[in-house]
């Protein structure tokens, strides 16, 4: 493959009233498949939602305060999150295959690093080698922090994880799918292009609900990549991956 992208899908984009939105995952599967076969682009996905799924399984209406309980929710929810992505991505993959008259097989892989592993040079190198190996074979790696074994992970956001992965892989771009259209100005209008993340840009940020990151963490992630010359696209998952990449009127592009 000529190109490599990292796609981060926020919890708020995947869940609708506490349940997995399979249409979002199907459209994502279609998008990454089309990019693979028509634009020589491999995709690495950074996913989240294990804790929320585990909360549902364990009967929690809101996030428990106890970190061990949060970790338990992550352990219960992580297998279900992978199952959901397998089903959803496969639906999009199969739709593309049918349109093109192809016989294709979807394979996904799961990577659950801890923050400490990413900070360790040898372990980080091994993680990256595995991601590139799978991506080059057409496998779609799904990455999530390993909340279930490291109590420090449950309070971290996956925007930062996505940026670190994109930087380490020297990806061609990071796409952050969320439930808003991108960065909005003080009047609620979409900011289509940002070339520098300064105090004026940071002042436009707000928080969010179920996830651990809001627009602030997305800008922090983009700022990290800006220094590396890697562009970041932030946009609403409802438009689909392809439209966000192609149409500058529906997303925020952060690039020099």
Features from the language model and the residues they span:
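C-terminal catalytic "cap/lid" subdomain
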Residues: 1-256
